[in-house]
UniProtKB/Swiss-Prot annotation:
Protein name: SKI family transcriptional corepressor 1 homolog-B
Cellular component, GO annotation: cytoplasm; nucleus; transcription regulator complex
Biased composition (Polar residues): 14-27, 244-259, 539-558
Database matches in SUPFAM superfamilies: Putative DNA-binding domain (SSF46955), SAND domain-like (SSF63763)
Coiled-coil intervals: 666-704
Organism: Danio rerio
Family named by the database record: Belongs to the SKI family.
């Protein structure tokens, strides 16, 4: 009983209807109740028991022998769909089946089906689903009793799919598919309404019956065969891999006992059968897209197939290995190394772009598993699988740049989840050393402007912009920094050298950036140098120099010969700080010296307010408020009046006071006067804006106060109305108990 195929009878055609020999048990002498016998079903002996004058077979024994390669759920669903009713055993009958060896000792219940039903059930799983041999113009006279009921002609010649309109209604002459016909009814004078039991689209086989109750056995069997045709999806549509091609409508006749039958197998239930089964060697050399089948459950339950899969493709990417003699091992080593999850070591096929078409035969990157690998392996794998066109476009860049661009490649690699991580997290996963990233923290948002000059002007104070990469002119790539890189900018910007690969202007940009950052960081030392150089001037001239000393650095950048002689002295001593620390010192100096550095920032990025929509009114309000508070502080504060933080900054940068002093002296008086006028105009403009904000805020406060007063009045009216209504209801309903002064007045809302 272990090997099913070898015990099939030699001349038995599994697709034909049972002949009279198989039905001889029905035509014999009358059967005794609970009579035990043994019946051969597909060559397997099955215990049968006489119940209610009918010989019934043990369904559990059939499931454990003939259908042992199918799950209990599959067998149950197919039995229900075929309309096979299961009769439960009594405890006495169950004990008889136990002693006959059909049921194990631990069994609690057993279902019994007739031999004809058992043959139909096994045939739906094991037999070839060829249409029954019927006359050419034959039609079944069928009817159903769902709702008001209906009657029609089922034409088998039209029944070529599960949704084929093969039933012609006898009342309206319209054609319906079987699953729709049971919902189609006509009310006749003698019909009565019947609420159908479990009438859904898949239960038509239960509700659709032959109109003639006394039909011949041939018609009944043909009707059963027709009902079993497209039931639950036939697994005989494509032949198994490695088998010789023959038409499915002509099954092989006269198989010898040594030949394996073409019995398709599906989900295994017995774990013992999975060991020592070799796979066939005829594996196709191209991958196919797996189409999931309805009857497959979760992926964890799918083991390696026992026999060649009946589909032309393995389901859910269960690609078989290329090794011919390799044994599919233990059940806990089930391999899902297929199309969806290819791992580098055990995938049978190479990486192949099956979901997104490519031009020509370009190799595309696969989905890499997150396996622990040394960084060099990851780099080599990434470089080998780069697109050919990308490599030709970026041949001028360094390997570091091509690696970074590979991380930002197209949607086939689905790196959006990597961008959601921080920079350190994604770097540690991929094994890339932290020094392989460029510093190009421009913005977390994509700039709208497309030309390079306006971007450089827009982000002029934030660092050198290297321009967009050649070959990528879309706005998506204009901003070099991804969203996860601008989360923590000072991770990379402390140690990495700021190298611009394309323009090779790193040295000049670094010196200019150092001077501008250092000068912005030390406004108090500049004021000390001024006070030593221009002691004879009055307080107003001191304010003028304080306002304009920072612009001397911006104007002196156009004279690099004058700057580089002084800049080289201090290049080795000062490094470019991260932008957060720069802005922190910038805010500290603003609080001590009014709005001098604020004005410097406003004039150098004049276009920011027009081009950047992100500078909102809420951001300007505290800055303007700080400016207004510091108007009087400028005229009252002496240059020597400093705090401890300022002295620490002064110690770092005090020796550069002479440099700025020379620059200020070299400037013409007209330039200073011109810049002072600009600063005064800016101050007036900011004061006007702040006054407008203040007025609008006061108006809003007044509106809110009036709204609150109105709400208080409304609540008072509601409270009074509630009290009056309650008093009136007390008076109307209980006139003898309420004397007009009702004490029960629960407040509707708190006062």
């Amino acid at each position: 009983m272990e090997s099913i195929p070898n015990q099939l009878p030699a001349g038995r055609d599994s697709s034909c209807s049972p002949n009279s020999k198989d039905l001889q048990s029905y035509s014999g002498p009358p059967l005794k109740p609970n009579q035990v016998s043994e019946t051969s079903l597909y060559g397997i002996p099955i215990v049968s028991l006489v119940i209610d004058g009918q010989e019934r077979l043990c369904l559990a024994q059939i499931s454990n022998t003939l259908l042992k390669n199918y799950s209990y759920n599959e067998i149950h669903n197919r039995r229900v769909a075929l309309g096979i009713t299961c009769v439960q055993c009594t405890p006495v009958q169950l004990e008889i089946l136990r002693r006959a060896g059909a049921m194990p000792i631990s069994s609690r219940r057993c279902g019994m089906i007739t031999k004809r039903e058992a043959e139909r059930l096994c045939k739906s799983f094991l037999g070839a689903h060829s249409p029954p041999k019927l006359p050419e113009n034959f039609a079944f006279d069928v009817s159903h009793e769902c709702a008001w009921g209906s009657r029609g002609n089922f034409i088998p010649a039209r029944y070529n799919s599960s949704r084929a309109k093969c039933i012609k209604c006898s009342f309206c002459n319209m054609y319906f598919s079987p699953n729709k016909f049971i919902f189609h009814s006509h009310r006749t004078p003698e019909s009565k309404y019947t609420q159908p039991d479990a009438a859904n689209f898949n239960s038509w086989r239960r509700h659709l019956k032959l109109s003639d109750k006394n039909s011949s056995d041939d018609v009944i069997h043909a009707w059963e065969d027709v009902k079993a045709m497209f039931n639950g999806g036939s697994r005989k549509r494509t032949l198994p891999i490695g088998r010789s091609e023959s038409s499915p409508s002509q099954p092989p006749r006269g198989q010898t006992q040594g030949e394996p039958s073409d019995v398709p197998h599906k989900t295994l239930r017995c774990e013992d059968d999975r060991v020592n089964v070799t796979m066939p060697s005829s594996i196709r050399s191209y991958p196919v897209i797996p189409v999931p089948s309805k009857s497959f459950g979760m992926l964890q339950k799918i083991p390696p197939p026992l026999f060649p899969h009946p589909y032309g493709f393995p389901a859910f990417g269960l690609c078989q290995k290329k090794d011919d003699g390799e044994v599919m091992g233990e059940p806990n080593k089930t391999n899902l190394s297929g199309v969806f999850w290819p791992s580098p070591k055990d995938s049978a096929y190479t990486s192949f772009p099956m979901f997104w078409p490519t031009t020509g035969s370009l190799a595309m990157p696969t989905y890499h598993h997150a396996q622990p690998k040394p960084p060099s392996d990851v780099l080599c794998a990434r470089h080998n699988e780069l697109d050919v066109s990308e490599q030709s476009d970026r041949s001028t860049s360094t390997p570091k740049d091509s690696l970074l661009d590979n991380e930002r490649c197209s949607s086939t690699q689905s790196t959006r989840n990597e961008e959601d991580k921080s920079g350190d997290e994604s770097r540690s996963i991929e094994g890339i050393p932290p020094t392989s990233r460029k510093i190009s923290y421009i913005s977390a948002f994509r700039p709208v402007v497309k030309d390079v000059e306006s971007i450089a002007k827009l982000y002029g104070n934030r660092g050198p912009y290297s321009g967009p990469r050649s070959g990528y002119m879309s706005p998506d790539f204009l901003s070099e920094s991804s969203s996860y890189r601008s989360v923590s900018p000072d991770v990379d910007s402390v140690d990495d050298p700021d190298v611009d690969v394309e323009s090779h202007k790193a040295h000049e940009d670094e010196e200019c950036l150092q001077l501008s950052v250092d000068d912005r960081r030390s406004p108090h030392s500049l004021t000390l140098a001024q006070s030593e150089g221009v002691k004879g001037q009055d307080q107003e001239n001191t304010q003028m120099h304080t306002l304009n000393d920072l612009h001397s650095t911006n104007s002196s950048e156009t004279r690099p010969s004058d700057m580089e002689s002084h800049g080289n002295k201090h290049t080795t001593r000062f490094e470019v700080y991260a932008r957060e620390r720069d802005e922190h010192v910038h805010q500290m100096s603003t609080s001590y010296f009014g709005s001098a550095t604020t004005y410097q920032r406003e004039t150098s990025v004049k276009d920011v307010h027009e081009e950047e929509p992100s500078s909102t009114v809420e951001e300007m309000e505290p800055k303007n408020h700080q400016d207004e508070n510091n108007i009087s502080e400028e005229r009252l504060k002496e240059p020597n009046d400093v705090c401890a933080d300022e002295e620490a900054i002064c110690k770092d940068t005090g020796n550069r006071g002479s440099l700025i002093e020379k620059n200020i002296e070299s400037m013409a008086k007209e330039e200073l006067q011109k810049q002072l006028v600009e600063q005064v105009e800016l101050r007036k403009k900011l004061e006007r804006e702040f006054q407008n904000l203040k007025d609008s805020f006061q108006d809003q406060m007044k509106r809110e106060l009036s709204y609150r007063e109105e709400m208080v009045q409304q609540l008072q009216i509601v409270r009074e109305a509630h009290d009056a209504l309650h008093h009136f209801s007390c008076k109307m309903l209980t006139p003898r108990h309420c004397t007009g002064t009702c004490t029960f007045k629960p407040p509707l809302l708190p006062p």
